[in-house]
Amino acid sequence: MYLADEAEFVLLMSNRSRIPDEQLKAFVRVYRLPIVSLRRSVWVALMYLPALLYCSWLIRGILRRERCSRLQFNDFHFAHGAVLRALGYRGRIATWVRLDPLKFGTIGRLWLALARLSSDRLIAVSKYIRGRVAAPDVEIVFDPVPDVPVLMPSSEPNLVFMGSYQTIKGQKEAIEAFHRIAGKHPAARLIFYGSDLGLPGSQAYFAELQDQAKLGAGAERIEFRPIVKDPADALKSARAALCFSRSEPFGLVCQEASAYGIPMIATRSGGPEEIIEDGHTGYLVDVDDVAAMSNRMDQLLSDPELARRLGAAGPEIVRKRFRPSDYANSLRHIYDL
């Protein structure tokens, strides 16, 4: 954890989170709370306000007990900050904006307004997100690049796609593009690592993807595997990694793959454009442009040396652009440490 030797960090998280305690040892204490997220459900909508007030009251008690003078919200849709201000909390609040607020419509604008009112600092994770927030006082703090070994592209003709199964992520387009070039590359495989998150909409989309995978030239060579804890476990067998999102706030997969030395094929969907240098560390294609996706797949599957050259350029670029030391200095500035 960054700045662990300069401050003590207490983590407040949902009691529905499956993250085991052994992965949270960097925090001096961890509190699991009944944090409710607003969803398209009548019951959840009815319970949202009472749950928000109750959870905020619990948080206020923890902040007093822990004598916390600084509070970070990991995204703008946590409206607890506004309630805490009403309850008298006077500590410093910084709110990260990791999701695109415009995709939530009216409720997104309300959440963002509450975050602005209650926060001392509003932090965007990319230039793209700062533009979507459209406020001059929003700061940018890029996620730091992980310190990982360079793998370089695999000699195996595998394309890897990591991400939860959501229509916005673009797995459907990846399958369509792969089917187009599968006949030319009989040894190539398209491997998905993901999860349906236990959500009905994602489960339905996952079922559609499985059906789509069976109907094309690459039917026998499209695999769906569970999400992995360590990206290296997925990327070590990859010639290239894919990210075909329609809207991507930052693109952690793009950053991780580049750090490992794996070239990316990604859409011009926001964050990836700030990570990938087109033609130098990977390729950028337009959203939903399946023809361009399949063309870039074909190029990297046909030319292992090209994949190695693009992959080799990635680690140096992302390590300079997303230095952990810059991230740590930004946190010191935000929290006046």
Which residues does each PLM region occupy?
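Carbohydrate-associated surface elements
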Residues: Y128, P144
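Conserved acidic donor-binding segment of nucleotide-sugar-dependent glycosyltransferases
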Residues: D278-G279, Y283-V290, Q299-P304
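Short, structured helix-loop element that forms part of the nucleotide-activated donor/catalytic region
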Residues: P20-L24, I191-A219
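Short His-centered aromatic/hydrophobic patch
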Residues: L52-C55, F73-A79, V97
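Short hydrophobic beta-strand element within catalytic cores of glycosyltransferases
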Residues: P263-A266
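Conserved donor-binding/catalytic core segment of Leloir-type glycosyltransferases
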Residues: L151-K169, I175-H179, L190-Y193
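A short, well-ordered alpha-helix in the C-terminal region of glycosyltransferases
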Residues: A292, Q299, L306-K320, Y327-S330
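Aromatic "clamp/platform" in nucleotide-sugar-dependent glycosyltransferases that forms part
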Residues: I227, R246
